[in-house]
Design a protein with these regions (language model features):
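N-terminal structural module
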Residues: 1-14
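A generic structural motif
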Residues: 7-10, 54, 99-101
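A general marker of short, structured functional hotspots
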Residues: 12-13, 34, 61, 138
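Short amphipathic beta-strand/extended segments with alternating polar/hydrophobic composition
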Residues: 1, 48-51, 112-115
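C-terminal edge-of-domain segments
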Residues: 83-148
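Short, structured beta-strand-loop surface elements
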Residues: 23-97
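A short, sequence-level motif marking secondary-structure junctions
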Residues: 4-5, 51-55, 107-109
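Ligand/cofactor pocket segment of small-molecule handling proteins
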Residues: 18
């Protein structure tokens, strides 16, 4: 569902809105292991491994609710299932990060192209990105560190 990606615990827990009356809720109850992948326009990416749980806490839903979520639920015109923050179908999936891998360049498109061309001319392998593994211990430390 849309609505952005709210975060908790210094960004180590990601929240996604969901319709709790769907099969994915049953699937997560059976096997909570998930992997999320993200990529940006310059090809940098992140892969997050973790566990997911469905959360129906109304206060949490209300805190992150945006009216655009109605487009994903619809109004059943029964006075209850209206796509609002009070719609009982609306819940959240909390993904608790366990480990992550990311590939970051920090160079942008032109910097990457420059490195590829230089590699092609010199015969050296182009270094277009740095691969970073984030361990469970690092995630746990990140989760509990006070951020300014």
């Amino acid at each position: 569902m849309g609505g952005g990606t709210p975060q908790e615990n210094n960004g180590t827990d990601l929240l996604f809105f969901t319709n709790t009356h769907t099969h994915k809720v049953d699937e997560l109850a059976h096997d909570p292991h998930v992997n999320l992948s993200f990529v940006n326009a310059v090809g940098e990416w992140a892969s997050v491994a973790g566990s997911a749980a469905v959360v129906t806490d109304r206060e949490l839903v209300k805190r992150h609710y945006t009216p655009t979520l109605r487009a994903w639920l619809g109004d059943l015109e029964d006075g209850t299932h209206d796509g609002s923050e009070n719609d009982p179908r609306l819940g959240m999936i909390r993904v608790r990060m366990e480990t992550a891998t990311c590939s970051l360049s920090g160079k942008g498109v032109f910097g990457t192209v420059k490195d590829v061309v230089a590699g092609a001319v010199s015969g050296r392998v182009a270094c277009v990105a740095k691969l970073r593994e984030i361990s469970r211990a690092e995630v746990d430390l990140w989760r509990t560190t006070e951020m300014a």
